[in-house]
């Protein structure tokens, strides 16, 4: 589970999906560029929110977390924020929505399972990412 969860570190899998899709779909490259930039924005905004909120990661009755983390801060979950920003943005850009949202939900849930996030951290990150994804959708419609 820890290996699977690592796919979401710093939004890596979502950035890779966007960059590869943009490389393959030349006509849609500007759309993929905007969608991929949205994943990066989600990560940056999430990092700023963590520094403001400063919520510590869970410590469950002396049980060790099953995965390492880059920081001791937990709210909101960057895995969830980048995952839902990616799923929302890329499904609007032309990729199939169901597998994207399944991957986003699985990566997000893995963080709770591994003991590095509270469920509310994941929910907060998912809402942040989805809100940014909706913003991108409005931009697509406006062009």
Across the structure, where does each feature detected by a protein language model lie?
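Membrane-water interface at transmembrane helix exits
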Residues: 21, 45-54, 91, 133-141
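Short helix-capping/hinge motifs at transmembrane helix termini and TM-loop junctions
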Residues: 9, 24-26, 53-54, 115-118
